[in-house]
Amino acid sequence: MANVAVIGAQWGDEGKGKVVDWLASRADVVVRFQGGHNAGHTLVVGDQTYKLSLLPSGLVRGKLGIIGNGVVVDPEALLSEIARVSAQGLAVGPETLRIADNATLILPLHGAIDRAREQARGDSKIGTTGRGIGPAYEDKVARRAIRIADLAEPETLSAKLDELLLHHNTLLAGLGAETFEKQALLDQLLALAPKILPYAEPVWERLDEIKRAGQRILFEGAQAVMLDVDHGTYPFVTSSNTIAATAAGGSGMGPSAVDFVLGIAKAYSTRVGSGPFPTELFDETGELLGDRGHEFGTVTGRRRRCGWFDAVLVRQAVKVGGIQGLALTKLDVLDGLPELKICTGYQINGETFRRLPASPAAQAAAKPVYESMEGWSGSTQGARSWADLPAQAIKYVRRIEELTEVPVTLLSTSPDRDDTILVKDPFEG
């Protein structure tokens, strides 16, 4: 049986939650391998709607959830999320959730620095969620992070906090923000330890056992390829690598761990916050896409920017992300539009490009080259087979396949998990 990684192929918010939920019902284990609680999934199960930011989506299907070492974990946010879903009747405990003991912790000072920096940027804001993800990754790379395993060694925490505060309080003071007292942080960590440590273990060992037992593993990515810290629209990106290759390192498994990479893309484009967006629409069509698609962020509540499908961007995501099949979502949002446009290239300073350059100045200057297609008047909502789709809708999907150079293996036609057209089963490789 194949192990599957699911990643976003645009700027996030592509509908990964529904697709992951659909796949999780057929997996044995669901693994988070990067990011933090800065991205959200909305899952509808029966009459319950779950909003998850840190917990693996498979938990709502009764599957084992694993948070890998590549994730930065805010312990307060984790416990709050567990309490919230538990109040909805979902049992989450050490039997159903395991967390890598070498995962980095997000502390209150990380969020404080995140917000202070963003405020200091003024009009040049990156658009972070202010939840401390970036500063926590900085500490990890600088080898001063406090990790979950450190909670089991309280005698070492004081010295580690000294090093941490030497760095962060200097930054906070320079930004004119309030600094932190060591004792308050130490007391908080000591109080959290007995609540967090029961979930901790070297998850690489468990995942090795799961793999050798032939069980199905679903790797659940957060954010998307175009928010990757290396391959995205830098500096308007997240602080981790979001491509499928990260699934191995972020969970403690080797590169052979992933057999199939499924990329999620909307049938149009959206983006939250700042950064280049060549196909963004500022007219009534853009408003229509936002209203029909209910385009508001799960975590921030911010209205998403909307535009036409960018085949150049998604093709690039396919190549650098290792995507072998696309799950195309929200096709029904395009129902009734008389004309559709797909971006097939960019004009930048008089030159035509079939890629998004790395230079921020070139990205900001990119003007889309469009190909127009006839829309469809019929409804695609709730379609569960190709026969249910209007002919023009099928043509639109086929053209996306041609331009992105990857097959559409799954098509979503409504938020309902059963309104899905399966072309190829990702778990069959």
Swiss-Prot record:
Q: Matching NCBIfam families, A to Z?
A: PRK01117.1, purA
Cofactor annotation remark: Binds 1 Mg(2+) ion per subunit.
Q: Name one GO cellular component term.
A: cytoplasm
Major subcellular site: cytoplasm
What is the reaction catalyzed?
A: IMP + L-aspartate + GTP = N(6)-(1,2-dicarboxyethyl)-AMP + GDP + phosphate + 2 H(+)
Which residues hold substrate? 298-304
Which UniProt keywords are given for this protein, alphabetically ordered?
Cytoplasm, GTP-binding, Ligase, Magnesium, Metal-binding, Nucleotide-binding, Purine biosynthesis
Taxonomic lineage per UniProt? Bacteria, Pseudomonadati, Pseudomonadota, Alphaproteobacteria, Acetobacterales
Describe the function of this protein. Plays an important role in the de novo pathway of purine nucleotide biosynthesis. Catalyzes the first committed step in the biosynthesis of AMP from IMP.
**Active site location:** 13 (proton acceptor), 41 (proton donor)
Question: Where along the chain is Mg(2+) bound?
Answer: 13, 40
Gene Ontology BP annotations: 'de novo' AMP biosynthetic process; IMP metabolic process
What's the encoding gene here? purA
Name the chain's protein. Adenylosuccinate synthetase
> What positions does the entry give for GTP binding?
12-18, 40-42, 304, 330-332, 412-414
Q: How does it assemble?
A: Homodimer.
The Swiss-Prot or TrEMBL record annotates one GO molecular function as: adenylosuccinate synthase activity
Q: Where does IMP bind?
A: 13-16, 38-41, 129, 143, 223, 238, 302
Q: Which family does it belong to?
A: Belongs to the adenylosuccinate synthetase family.
What EC number(s) has UniProt assigned to this enzyme? 6.3.4.4
Tell me what organism the protein belongs to: Granulibacter bethesdensis (strain ATCC BAA-1260 / CGDNIH1)
Q: What class of enzyme is it?
A: ligase
Q: List required co-factors.
A: Mg(2+)
Xref: SMART domains: Adenylsucc_synt
Q: Which InterPro entries match?
A: Adenylosuccin_syn_GTP-bd, Adenylosuccin_syn_Lys_AS, Adenylosuccinate_synth_dom1, Adenylosuccinate_synth_dom2, Adenylosuccinate_synth_dom3, Adenylosuccinate_synthetase, P-loop_NTPase
Please name the pathway. Answer: Purine metabolism; AMP biosynthesis via de novo pathway; AMP from IMP: step 1/2
